């Protein structure tokens, strides 16, 4: 008979009925040295087999601690929205820069300009999966995302120094390569802290960053392009890259101190809050990881065999294709009765 989890231990934890298929780490413990537990073992029994002591806390006290935990966590994770805004600003400012002479100054024909737009996604595709495989193996994902943001901010700034097609293509490829670390990494960090029911709302708020960026990127671009032309002898489109890139670097430095890491090692939380954070996710999953002895390539193989992955790929491809007009929207608007200033 399965062991029961006492009220002083894990309240309401469910008996496991299947083996865990994703690699989730808690409290930095290593389960690779122990054999996988039987599929019908209780959560407490699995924890005991691996030498893990589940935290104990009074139910009434837990409610108060959990409320404080989520309040702090929501405040710190809200910076993800700002990072997502800058992520989209830095990849889409090429369309705004085209208004003030980028294409003419760099002597790009229409095909070369379109190549500069598209090459970003080549780097993005190449790096997304390896980046998330890597971030899942490190203990300080906040520094990884902040470091990636700092790098893409520097690369975006260098776009203002491009002198021709070759340099712009190289910069745009590197920009996509580094930017690829953000979105899947952000979703991974959120999944380490929030339960499945809570994730729905947080993921929706995260994607608001995309919408906000689309709403205000043209206004930001218009402000810079209208007032910075000729300042210090440089074209306005160069200032657009320099200003937005500098803003990205500033936010990256701030995010290194604000973003959370993992429940067991994040600064700014009490020990009690960290214990509750770990306990919440263990209870939500309903079981401990029995596949921790598998490497990242095993997880990749499992994902490639999952038909739901391909359904999501098709859906997201249709979504991105539908939004691709953003890269040419400014030019389309100029084909109407609107002027560049409008």
Please provide the spans of the model-predicted regions.
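Central mid-sequence intracellular linker of multi-pass
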Residues: 2, 196-210, 219, 225, ...
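Cytosolic juxtamembrane N-terminal segment immediately preceding the first transmembrane helix
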Residues: 2-94, 104, 301
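Extracytoplasmic
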Residues: 75-110, 126-127, 131, 217-221, ...
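Short hydrophobic/small-residue motifs within alpha-helical transmembrane segments
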Residues: 84, 121-125, 211-213
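Extracytoplasmic gate region of multi-pass secondary transporters
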Residues: 95-96, 295-342
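Conserved MFS/SLC helix-loop-helix module at the cytosolic interface between two early adjacent transmembrane helices
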Residues: 125-168
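Short hydrophobic/alpha-helical segments at membrane-entry points of transmembrane helices
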Residues: 144-145, 164-172, 184, 235-236, ...
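Hydrophobic core of transmembrane alpha-helices in multi-pass small-molecule transporters
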Residues: 155-156, 167-181, 189
């Amino acid at each position: 008979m399965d062991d029961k989890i006492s009220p002083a231990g894990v309240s309401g934890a469910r008996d496991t009925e299947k083996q865990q298929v994703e690699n989730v780490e808690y409290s930095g413990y290593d389960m690779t040295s122990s054999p996988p537990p039987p599929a019908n073992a209780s959560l407490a029994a699995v924890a005991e087999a691996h030498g893990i002591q589940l935290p104990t806390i009074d139910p009434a006290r837990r409610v108060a601690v959990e409320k404080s935990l989520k309040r702090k966590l929501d405040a710190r994770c809200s910076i993800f929205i700002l990072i997502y805004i800058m992520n989209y600003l830095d990849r889409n400012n090429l369309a705004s820069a085209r208004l003030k002479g980028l294409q003419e100054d760099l002597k790009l024909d229409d095909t070369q300009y379109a190549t500069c737009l598209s090459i970003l996604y080549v780097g993005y595709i190449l790096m997304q999966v390896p980046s998330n495989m890597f971030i899942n193996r490190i203990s300080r994902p906040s520094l990884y995302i902040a470091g990636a943001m700092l790098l893409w901010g520097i690369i975006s700034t260098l776009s203002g120094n491009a002198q021709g097609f070759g340099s712009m293509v190289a910069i745009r490829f590197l920009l996509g390569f580094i930017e690829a670390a953000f979105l899947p990494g952000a979703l991974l960090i959120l999944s380490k802290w929030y339960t499945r029911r809570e994730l729905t709302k947080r993921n929706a708020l995260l994607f608001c960053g995309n919408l906000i960026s689309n709403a205000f990127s043209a206004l930001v671009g218009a402000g810079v392009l209208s007032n910075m032309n000729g300042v210090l002898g440089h074209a306005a489109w160069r200032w657009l890259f320099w200003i937005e890139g500098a803003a990205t670097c500033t936010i990256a430095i701030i995010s290194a101190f604000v973003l959370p890491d993992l429940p067991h090692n994040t600064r700014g939380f009490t020990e009690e809050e960290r214990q509750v954070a770990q306990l919440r996710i263990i209870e939500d999953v309903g079981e401990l990881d029995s596949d921790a002895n598998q490497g990242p390539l095993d997880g990749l193989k499992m994902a490639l065999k999952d038909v739901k992955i391909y359904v999501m790929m098709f859906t997201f491809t249709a979504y991105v294709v539908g939004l691709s007009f953003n890269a040419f929207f400014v030019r389309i608007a100029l084909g109407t009765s609107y002027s560049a200033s409008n």
